[in-house]
Amino acid sequence: MRFAIVVTGPAYGTQQASSAFQFAQALIAEGHKLSSVFFYREGVYNANQLTSPASDEFDLVRGWQQLNAQHGVALNICVAAALRRGIVDETEAGRLGLASSNLQPGFTLSGLGALAEASLTCDRVVQF
C-alpha cells in the first residue's frame, strides 16, 4: 500500500512529528511504500538545519533526512509556511536578499500541489 504523511507539528515541543516519524518507520518495516512526507504549518520547523537538540535527545531533523537518503521518501515543505517561519533554501535566500539559507539537505520547498498529488496517487494520507 502507498502512503503519504502530513506533519503539522514542529520537531520539538509536541508529539506530532515524533509520532509521524515512528509511523513512517513502521510503514517501511512492514513493507509499505512511503511516497512522501508533506510538512505544513509548524511542521516546517522539521526542515530547519539550525536545530541542535541536546546530546541525549533523538535528532528528529536528521532522522527525516536519513529517511530520505535511505528510502527515497520525498520530504516536501510548504513554501508559504516555511517563508513565514524563516525556513529558506538558497534560491529563496538569494531572491529575498538574505545572508544564508537554513533548509536541511533532503528537504524541498514545495507548493500545496505536492500535497494534492500525494493525495491523488497514494492509497492513504495520514496527518499528524
Curated annotation (Swiss-Prot):
Active-site residues from the entry: C78 (cysteine persulfide intermediate)
Enumerate the InterPro entries for this protein: DsrEFH-like, Sulphur_relay_DsrE/F-like, Sulphur_relay_TusD/DsrE
One GO cellular-component annotation of the UniProt record comes to: sulfurtransferase complex
Enzyme Commission number(s) from the entry = 2.8.1.-
Q: Kind of enzyme, top EC level?
A: transferase
List the molecular function annotations (GO) for this entry: sulfur carrier activity; sulfurtransferase activity
Pfam families referenced in this protein's UniProt entry, alphabetically: DsrE
Q: Which GO terms describe its biological process?
A: tRNA wobble position uridine thiolation
Q: Where in the cell is it found?
A: Cytoplasm
What does the UniProt function comment say about this protein? Part of a sulfur-relay system required for 2-thiolation of 5-methylaminomethyl-2-thiouridine (mnm(5)s(2)U) at tRNA wobble positions. Accepts sulfur from TusA and transfers it in turn to TusE.
The record's note on quaternary structure and interaction partners says: Heterohexamer, formed by a dimer of trimers. The hexameric TusBCD complex contains 2 copies each of TusB, TusC and TusD. The TusBCD complex interacts with TusE.
Can you tell me which family this protein belongs to? Belongs to the DsrE/TusD family.
Name of this protein: Sulfurtransferase TusD
Q: Which organism is it from?
A: Shigella flexneri
Gene (UniProt):
tusD
